[in-house]
């Protein structure tokens, strides 16, 4: 009887060990399955992390490029601002220079016109400003005790011989040639300046303040 009980106890122990082994194997299989699933998930996570890292790298590259482009644009805008400010300053300086030049030009013209008026009275010569610079047209008045002598002239401004003849003729009549020539020169300068923006007449293309006069025509007396 005792032997039978011993065998039954042994069988139970063996059976228990067997069942325990089965449970351990089941747990081991379950654990292996979980480990495999974990490894699989971990691999997926690593791949996702790599993909994310690549995307982040591309995004960082784009951000860097955009930042460099933005820096260039900012630098360009700053350069434009500096250039604009410099242009404004140059424009203001130019306006001041132009204003000063105009003022000096008006002053010079007034001085020249005053000189022309004085020389005209001194020499008795009156110039037709409308005929200049193509022609020198006017009259020189020689005042006498009883009557005045008029010497009219309608002169082309490119005749050297005419200028020489006129100068000799007026000089023979005791006209101050230095003042007379200065009067003609100043009147010519004023005419040239006033007509500078427009197309000059063909006859004035080579104008050098040279005068002609026909001395064969008789002089007039009053």
From Swiss-Prot:
It comes from the Eukaryota. One of its GO terms (cellular component) is Ndc80 complex. GO terms for biological process: cell division; meiotic metaphase chromosome alignment; meiotic spindle organization; mitotic metaphase chromosome alignment. Keywords: Cell cycle, Cell division, Centromere, Chromosome, Coiled coil, Kinetochore, Meiosis, Mitosis, Nucleus. Disulfide bonds: none annotated. Its main location: nucleus. Residues 51-100 form a coiled coil. It is found in: Nucleus; Chromosome, Centromere, Kinetochore. Acts as a component of the essential kinetochore-associated Ndc80 complex, which is required for chromosome segregation and spindle checkpoint activity during meiosis and mitosis. Required for kinetochore integrity and the organization of stable microtubule binding sites in the outer plate of the kinetochore. Participates in SAC signaling that responds specifically to disruptions in spindle microtubule dynamics. The NDC80 complex synergistically enhances the affinity of the SKA1 complex for microtubules and may allow the NDC80 complex to track depolymerizing microtubules. Belongs to the SPC25 family. Component of the Ndc80 complex, which is composed of Ndc80, Nuf2 and Spc25. This is Kinetochore protein Spc25. It comes from Drosophila sechellia (Fruit fly). The lineage of its organism: Eukaryota, Metazoa, Ecdysozoa, Arthropoda, Hexapoda. The gene is Spc25.
